[in-house]
Amino acid sequence: MNRISVLGCGRWGSFIAWYLATKKGKEVFSWGPEGDYSYEVLKNTGKNEYVTLDPSITLTCDLAAAVQRAEIVI
């Protein structure tokens, strides 16, 4: 199981996405609702106060696409 979607991109979600991509080599989709503060910060800067997202992580606000692409949804 290599394609994982993490629903939510706040503190925990961004860390889980980062960990799975950088430490476990998984293909990760990180979903957040458009307009949400955490999503907008990650979209605009690629990082928050805790982690810098790996470039391999796909950040999206399209919930259907995030779920359809994944083998596992967290």
Features from the language model and the residues they span:
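NAD(P)+-binding Rossmann beta1-loop-alpha1 motif at the extreme N-terminus of oxidoreductases
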Residues: M1-L53, I57-V67
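An anion/phosphate-binding loop that grips the pyrophosphate of nucleotide cofactors and donors
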Residues: A70-E71
